[in-house]
């Protein structure tokens, strides 16, 4: 029997984290669909007081209606309006997002990008390692897949492009004892490689900022930066102040913002796709296609070999991404549940 050798590319969206939280039965206190609902619990780094999302700390977001406890649809509409305005501003000839602006949506954008960082740091600290171990012991589909690929000698490499800010993926791999490389940072020969084009709560400047002087800057100075200025620190704590925030909010069109680190990582994601051959596999997991940069995902799709094997894991088998994939690739399979993943690649 000839052993099949393949490279695996996995592209992940918010759905995998939602699936994990559902498995943990923590959907209420770790709500990844409504990003404002738990905003009053998020700590303000300067003094550790809960209430990051408040009139005092985020006046522009508050004026636009962002409140702890609001409904998901309203929260998503507020974020969509803010990011749409920021996208247009970032690509205009006189971008107000680059400097001080009196526009409430641009002010809200600067509040949002920083609030999201500390929201996900708060969520990360709420999930204990013992809980992740229980999920693995319970044979969660994604963890079973990672274990199989790690021990499969026919699998040459596993590259994971994730648009999630959280580090639940990295922590799961850590509990599994799987070594990985964070692309764009220190190189190593790990079989597993992770690429985060939209940033991460684990990315921070090497030199920390002054915690007591923490505040929201309403200009470009706190956004972007070169990759060389950043390190990966998975001991994410709210009192470790990064001088730059590299995270791009949901639906933020990354190529408009001219962030050096984001553009480099975005280009690397295309390169990962271009390297794949016919015998290789691509898995899209929990990617809505609406809450990420659609043009960025299209760039990955159009970089793939049309004969590559494509799998999608998403509860909605009639979603837009599936329609796009089926129009481009003939070798396409859709799974509605992650439980099936542990049984893949048994050949």
What does each model-found stretch correspond to?
Residues 170-175, 205-211, 295-296:
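A short secondary-structure junction signal
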Residues 23-35, 174-180, 212, 299-300:
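Short secondary-structure boundary/capping segments
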Residues 44, 186-203, 308-325:
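Short, flexible loop segments at boundaries between secondary-structure elements
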Residues 50, 220-277:
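Acidic, metal/cofactor-coordinating or nucleic-acid-engaging core segments within structured domains
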Residues 20, 133-194, 202:
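Metabolite-binding pocket within alpha/beta catalytic cores that recognizes anionic/polar moieties
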Residues 1-156:
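Gly/serine-rich nucleotide phosphate-binding loop at the start of the catalytic core
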Residues 1-20, 29, 52, 259, ...:
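SIR2/sirtuin-family catalytic core signature
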